[in-house]
């Protein structure tokens, strides 16, 4: 049986999965990866730990399926995270600075005069979330990096580039548009790096990876790692990968990945839309054809459940929240705004901070757990309403994936608060499957995206709205009030 191997490098886990042509998982190996919090608002990872997790998991999957069965490899990854490394030694010059890291707020504030140019050409906002200011921080703050860049020793990449470089034994330094378009350095209209943006962020062009099409031959694995050379034929950022696997119809359907954050995407076609409070981005490029998307990125989604579990010790496992939420009939006025790293779309307030409001003497763990799940659904509605404003099109269905999509209370409440159906696919590993699809189309496993979707997509459950409109709007208006209380908090 021929398989495509997908390498999925997330924020908290690395997964390597072998998929058959019908999308079934033939083999899987995964490892948890740790985060480092050196200071408040800073989030890092050890790039060598990421690579080691990939290397070990890939080795285990290859042992399970056998080298002869492997058609190709695809890569998907957490986006915006930056790594700079010495291309001679392969050693990172600093830890990976993660997407949710806020240390570059001041850098972004000082560059505010360029925000219009940045928005118009990248589709993104001038915000610490994206890669460019993080790269600038490393260049300006880590000893010796500037000189080593001048000597041509140091190169930059997002996580996909770092994994690709290591897989190929340091031979290939490339990326693709779905990742490049998240750096604030890439012009999404011209599909190339923008010299003006490089000047704004003081980043030399010679450290940047070459940009391939998303579905193309990036290179071959080094024999010392995989035993034989295996073609690497597809790369997509994690959210674009899940969008690809959902088979979303343009402008009618939205996908939401319920992960550490919440990532909503709407496919918009062959011309870029530059939205006001959301993000315009590249979905993928296949056979010379570019597809664009609008994205709403919510910084804290499932992470608020992890916080209840790891920091407050209120629950033992994430699944406990479903039972707790269902055990009470309402939130009793308790709202939780989980602005741990500020607020992302559509507010983009880096100075917002988390609050739990409406607490009384009757408030119990059940109310806090329910408020956390409801916050995920409210933030999703915030983004969908903004998408509808930008496009003038009413969204007909939400397609869900990610860990928290397995929570039935959340999915039902999501349908209720939106007033539209929420569809959950049978396949849990949508992000990894999307990377397999983009790779397998180039390597001949599937003839087209349409064939890939037909072979692999299967709906497990559809949640239909049951809540009355008046009740829905009352809940949501209270949420909006709570958000106002959380905004600008660190500036007060």
Swiss-Prot record:
Highest rank taxon of the organism: Bacteria
Name assigned to this protein: Glycerol kinase
Binding site for ATP: 11-12, 260, 302, 403
Biological role stated in the UniProt entry: Key enzyme in the regulation of glycerol uptake and metabolism. Catalyzes the phosphorylation of glycerol to yield sn-glycerol 3-phosphate.
Positions of sn-glycerol 3-phosphate binding: 11, 79-80, 129, 238
Chain positions recorded as glycerol binding sites: 79-80, 129, 238-239
Protein's pathway: Polyol metabolism; glycerol degradation via glycerol kinase pathway; sn-glycerol 3-phosphate from glycerol: step 1/1
NCBIfam families for the chain: glycerol_kin, PRK00047.1
PROSITE patterns: FGGY_KINASES_1, FGGY_KINASES_2
GO molecular function, one term: ATP binding
Organism per entry: Aquifex aeolicus (strain VF5)
EC numbers, comma separated: 2.7.1.30
Gene: glpK
Gene3D superfamilies (alphabetical): 3.30.420.40
CDD domains: FGGY_EcGK_like (cd07786)
Similarity comment text for this entry: Belongs to the FGGY kinase family.
């Amino acid at each position: 049986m021929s398989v495509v191997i997908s390498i999925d490098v997330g924020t908290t886990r690395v997964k390597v999965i072998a998929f058959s042509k019908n999308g079934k998982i033939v083999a899987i190996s995964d490892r948890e990866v740790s985060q480092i919090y050196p200071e408040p608002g800073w989030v890092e990872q050890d790039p060598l730990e990421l690579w080691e997790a990939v290397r070990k998991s890939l080795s285990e999957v290859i042992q399970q399926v056998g080298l002869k069965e492997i058609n190709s490899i695809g890569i998907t990854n957490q986006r915006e995270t930056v790594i700079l490394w010495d291309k001679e030694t392969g050693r990172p010059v600093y830890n990976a600075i993660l997407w949710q890291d806020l240390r570059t707020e001041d850098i972004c504030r000082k560059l505010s005069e360029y925000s219009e140019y940045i928005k118009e050409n990248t589709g993104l906002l001038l915000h610490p979330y994206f890669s460019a200011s993080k790269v600038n921080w490393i260049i300006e703050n880590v000893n010796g990096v500037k000189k080593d860049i001048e000597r041509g020793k140091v190169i930059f990449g997002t996580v996909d580039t770092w994994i690709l470089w290591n897989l190929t034994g340091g031979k290939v330094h490339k990326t693709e548009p779905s990742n490049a378009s998240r750096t604030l350095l890439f012009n999404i209209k011209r599909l190339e790096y923008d010299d003006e943006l490089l000047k704004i962020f003081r980043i030399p062009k010679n450290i940047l990876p070459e940009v391939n099409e998303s579905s193309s031959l990036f290179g071959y694995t080094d024999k010392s790692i995989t035993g034989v050379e295996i073609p690497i034929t597809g790369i997509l950022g994690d959210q674009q990968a899940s969008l690809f696997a959902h088979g979303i119809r343009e402008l009618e359907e939205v996908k939401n990945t319920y992960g550490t954050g919440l990532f909503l995407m709407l496919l918009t076609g062959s011309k870029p839309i530059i939205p006001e409070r959301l993000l315009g981005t590249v979905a993928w490029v296949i056979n010379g054809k570019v597809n664009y998307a609008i994205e709403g990125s919510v910084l804290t989604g499932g992470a608020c459940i992890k916080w209840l579990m790891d920091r407050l010790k209120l629950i033992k496992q994430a699944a406990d929240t479903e039972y707790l939420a269902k055990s009470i009939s309402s939130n009793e006025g308790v709202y939780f705004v989980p602005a741990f790293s500020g607020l992302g779309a559509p507010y983009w307030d880096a100075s917002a901070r988390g609050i739990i409001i409406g607490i009384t003497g009757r408030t119990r763990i059940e109310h806090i757990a329910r408020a956390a799940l409801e916050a995920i659904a409210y933030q999703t509605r915030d983004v969908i309403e903004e998408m509808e404003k930008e496009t003038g099109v009413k969204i007909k269905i939400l397609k869900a994936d990610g860990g928290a999509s397995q929570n039935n209370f959340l999915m039902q409440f999501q349908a209720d608060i939106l007033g539209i159906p929420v569809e959950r696919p049978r396949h849990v590993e949508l992000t990894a499957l999307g990377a397999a699809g983009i790779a397998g189309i180039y390597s001949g496993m599937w003839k087209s995206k349409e064939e890939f979707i037909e072979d692999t997509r299967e709906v497990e459950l559809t949640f239909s709205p049951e809540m009355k409109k008046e009740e829905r709007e009352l809940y949501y208006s209270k949420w909006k009030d709570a958000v106002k209380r959380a905004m600008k908090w660190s500036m007060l």
